[in-house]
Amino acid sequence: MIIHPKVRGFICTTTHPLGCERNVLEQIAATRARGVRNDGPKKVLVIGASSGYGLASRITAAFGFGADTLGVFFEKPGTASKAGTAGWYNSAAFDKHAKAAGLYSKSINGDAFSDAARAQVIELIKTEMGGQVDLVVYSLASPVRKLPGSGEVKRSALKPIGQTYTATAIDTNKDTIIQASIEPASAQEIEDTITVMGGQDWELWIDALEGAGVLADGARSVAFSYIGTEITWPIYWHGALGKAKVDLDRTAQRLNARLAKHGGGANVAVLKSVVTQASAAIPVMPLYISMVYKIMKEKGLHEGTIEQLDRLFRERLYRQDGQPAEVDEVDEQNRLRLDDWELRDDVQDACKALWPQVTTENLFELTDYAGYKHEFLKLFGFGRTDVDYDADVATDVAFDCIELV
């Protein structure tokens, strides 16, 4: 079929299989350009592997370190008459090109919060991956979590705490500057956000993997977080989501103590703001990202998801000098900070100066909103110059993926 983008709110309701594959190939090429190292992870599990930082982790592990990878995600496959989700096509493309490079690649499509997913992963590690993994990447960003056991469904809330938050934002449907107001989260919403986006599920995964004996000696685990700056703090770090990320930090410290007994460790990696399906849903973030992208590009500091993950692996988790990142690359909470360039004073001072100046009339001139829109469309396979969007494309793309029912 012929597929063009249809954007509604912060979601594009259509996806382009070939565009998604080209995105993945672009990330693979960026990774390969930095060389392949053999002193890093060999067997990698990525939980939340189909888009954003999770996908970039999988690409970096496979094509930057030659690792075998197992990816878990929850995506919708395409059919002959309907396109699937971008994450499905991303994962299909990864699988195709990993196998072409002689690397082991297997995927599980299902609820990554479920015990069934954990059981299937453990079975595959035992039967197909040599019995153990040495890196577990936890990269789930879901608005909903079904609790294992009870089946109770919890939902996260992108809300401030204590009082209504009003700020300048972009109406991304109309490309206009508006004042957005968000009501504060209730106590229940805060608690539920911690349950969905905090560290509980990460710990359940490590519990299950450790209990089954499939974590290698020296195994590491990393989960992703964002702290941001005072511009975004009310809605993020000081909001319900921030409480969940504090819980993630506490979990990391518990898991680190456990894994350290066997020569490994666990960290939260604090990453920079990038255009992902997750960040597009957070009010204020599109405007902030449009500003910070412009400033960081002008200073030669810009990084996308693949550049961030490449730096995380090569300069933090697996340093070439053999030293642990803890030597000089963590903050007081033992977090790996990859938001260091974004938080430079010169970058943030420029952002704060720009923020009050932006209007509907000068939005495209003062910020990189055009770049934001382009990156957003790319998430779904659109906006590429090397794809003919008026050409017919097959939407029923199959690959080596186990479907959990």
UniProtKB/Swiss-Prot annotation:
**GO terms classed as biological process:** fatty acid biosynthetic process
Q: List the disulfide bonds.
A: none
Q: Which residues form a coiled coil?
A: none
Chain positions recorded as NAD(+) binding sites: 48-53, 74-75, 111-112, 140-141, 245, 274-276
**E.C. numbers:** 1.3.1.9
Sample GO molecular function, one term:
trans-2-enoyl-CoA reductase (NADH) activity
Catalytic machinery residues: Y236
Name the catalysed reactions: a 2,3-saturated acyl-[ACP] + NAD(+) = a (2E)-enoyl-[ACP] + NADH + H(+)
InterPro entries xrefs? Eno_Rdtase_FAD-bd_dom, Enoyl-CoA_Rdtase_cat_dom, FabV-like_NADH_b, Trans-2-enoyl-CoA_reductase
The UniProt keywords, alphabetically, are: Fatty acid biosynthesis, Fatty acid metabolism, Lipid biosynthesis, Lipid metabolism, NAD, Oxidoreductase
Q: Where is this site: Plays an important role in discriminating NADH against NADPH?
A: E75
The pathway this protein participates in, as annotated, is:
Lipid metabolism; fatty acid biosynthesis
Enzyme superclass (EC): oxidoreductase
Q: Which residues bind substrate?
A: Y226
Q: How does it assemble?
A: Monomer.
Q: Its family?
A: Belongs to the TER reductase family.
The record describes the protein's role as: Involved in the final reduction of the elongation cycle of fatty acid synthesis (FAS II). Catalyzes the reduction of a carbon-carbon double bond in an enoyl moiety that is covalently linked to an acyl carrier protein (ACP).
Put simply, this protein is called: Enoyl-[acyl-carrier-protein] reductase [NADH]
Query: From which organism does this entry originate?
Result: Xanthomonas oryzae pv. oryzae (strain PXO99A)
Q: Which gene encodes it?
A: fabV
